[in-house]
Amino acid sequence: MIDYIKSTVRNRNTIRLLEKNQYTFDVDPKATKTEVKRLIEGVFGVKVIGMNSKRLPIKQKRKGPTAGYAVRYKRMIVTLNSTDSIPVI
């Protein structure tokens, strides 16, 4: 179940969201909000009060004469209780 979370997202927008106690993760496209919520609460010992999710657009990749598509992820924005935090490296 820990395999659902692929990586944390670090860019200008997600750093701004950290001030609001919101953390952004790329997760497996098959993962549901309930599964990710239970995973984050269990692993990090925090209280999740809200979640938003979106599917990232498909990007076409080309290598030589063959073309394909990049792996697609789902992005989750997790809002934590104001007293909780997750250590971000």
Curated annotation (Swiss-Prot):
InterPro entries per record: Nucleotide-bd_a/b_plait_sf, Ribosomal_uL23-like, Ribosomal_uL23/eL15/eS24_sf, Ribosomal_uL23_CS
Highest taxon in the source lineage: Eukaryota
Predominant subcellular localization, coarse grouping: plastid
Subcellular location: Plastid, Chloroplast
Any one Gene Ontology cellular component term annotated for this protein: chloroplast
Cited Pfam families: Ribosomal_L23
Keyword entries, A-Z: Chloroplast, Plastid, Ribonucleoprotein, Ribosomal protein, RNA-binding, rRNA-binding
One record GO biological process: translation
Transmembrane segments: none
GO molecular function, one term: rRNA binding
Family the entry assigns: Belongs to the universal ribosomal protein uL23 family.
HAMAP family in alphabetical order: Ribosomal_uL23_B
Subunit structure: Part of the 50S ribosomal subunit.
Function text: Binds to 23S rRNA.
UniProt protein name: Large ribosomal subunit protein uL23c
Natural source organism: Zygnema circumcarinatum
